[in-house]
Structures are given as structure tokens and as C-alpha cells.
């Protein structure tokens, strides 16, 4: 028992001081063709670390963003049906933003649903479509069913589906990664 307590404390300590990437909002655009294929753009607005005051964690989170998401395969793992993926970071309104563009063969592989190919298009707004979880509905060009039925409906004639989600509001413990990105010059 005496040996277990220090190990448990070490695990708790490591977990508590581990950084985490987050984002303020995400904007999704899916353009679909008659055959169900198309192209998508996902924009990540205000990429942040949630460990502003932890020594070295913002730098670690930034390196994770670059190495795992931008240069690495993390986004491809999050969206395995995406083809011809292009990723970039950029500055907008003094915030670090990211953008992922890709093609797809079938929009239903990205949580869209159309009942018997006749009804309206539907999208169930759950916690995430990949990178930076914990999403909440904010707006769309469709009709939102509300908190009790978190589904966006489109009448079936649209060829472009747009929606925006919120993830994390800036807070005392968060810090935008824009200054690190500017200082590193990785574009």
C-alpha cells in the first residue's frame, strides 16, 4: 500500500500538469455533389493552450500542434475518409487559426444522414468531428433542433452545408498560441 500511494500521486501529478490544445470556435463547410462526393473546409478559430501558467506547457502544446496536426498525421487519423488533405495555420484578427481542406467520396462518412435518400439532410451535433473535442452548436445555414435534439436539418436541396460550433471560451488559464507561432515563423 505504501508503494501504491507515491505511484498514484505521480500519475495524478503528471495528468494535472499536462497541457491541452483547445480552440474557441470551429466553422465547417461541406459542398456536396449529386453523387454524395464533394469537398470540405474546417476552420479552427483562436487555437489556444489551456495551461497558460504551467512552465513549458504552452511551448509543448505548440510543438504538438505543429508536429502532430500540421506536419503529422493526426488530422488524417481523425478524418480517415478525407482525401487530398491540405492544412495550414494563419493569423486572423490577431488570433491563430487553422484550416483543413479535403475531398470526400461520400458525405455520409462525416456524420451526415439522409433518410432513404428522400428526406432532409441531417447532421447530429455531438462532441466532435475530430481535433479539439467538446463542441456545442452555435449557428448554421440549416435548422437546429435544439439542445434536446441536437440535430441540424437541411431541406434536402442544399449543396452546401455550413455550421459553426463553440469549443472553449478564452479564460484565465488559456493562452492564444499566436505569439508562439509568430516567434517560430512556421507558416
Model-predicted segments: where are they?
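Positively charged n-region of N-terminal signal peptides that target proteins for export
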Residues: 1-4, 8-9
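Bacterial Sec-type N-terminal signal peptides, specifically the leucine/valine-rich hydrophobic h-region
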Residues: 14-17
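Short, surface-exposed coil-to-beta transition loops
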Residues: 23-27
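Post-signal peptide N-terminal segment of mature Sec-exported envelope proteins
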Residues: 28-46
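Residue-level signal for secondary-structure boundary sites
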Residues: 38, 48-50, 106-110
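Post-signal-peptide N-terminal segment of Sec-exported extracytoplasmic proteins
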Residues: 41-70, 138-141
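Mature, soluble, non-transmembrane domains
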Residues: 73-187
Amino acid at each position: 500500500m505504501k508503494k501504491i500511494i507515491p505511484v498514484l500521486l505521480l500519475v495524478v501529478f503528471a495528468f494535472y500538469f499536462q497541457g491541452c490544445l483547445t480552440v474557441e470556435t470551429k466553422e465547417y463547410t461541406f459542398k456536396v455533389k449529386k453523387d454524395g462526393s464533394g469537398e470540405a473546409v474546417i476552420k479552427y478559430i483562436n487555437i489556444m493552450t489551456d495551461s497558460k501558467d504551467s512552465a513549458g506547457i504552452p511551448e509543448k502544446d505548440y510543438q504538438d500542434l505543429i508536429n502532430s496536426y500540421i506536419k503529422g498525421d493526426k488530422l488524417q487519423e481523425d478524418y480517415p475518409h478525407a482525401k487530398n488533405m491540405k492544412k495550414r495555420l494563419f493569423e486572423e484578427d490577431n488570433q491563430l487559426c487553422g484550416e483543413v481542406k479535403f475531398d470526400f467520396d461520400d458525405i455520409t462518412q462525416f456524420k451526415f444522414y439522409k433518410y432513404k435518400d428522400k428526406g432532409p439532410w441531417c447532421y447530429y451535433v455531438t462532441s466532435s468531428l475530430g481535433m479539439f473535442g467538446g463542441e456545442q452548436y452555435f449557428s448554421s445555414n440549416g435548422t437546429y433542433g435544439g439542445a434536446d435534439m441536437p440535430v441540424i436539418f437541411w431541406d434536402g436541396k442544399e449543396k452546401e452545408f455550413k455550421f459553426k460550433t463553440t469549443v472553449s471560451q478564452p479564460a484565465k488559464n488559456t493562452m492564444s498560441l499566436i505569439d508562439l507561432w509568430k516567434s517560430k515563423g512556421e507558416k
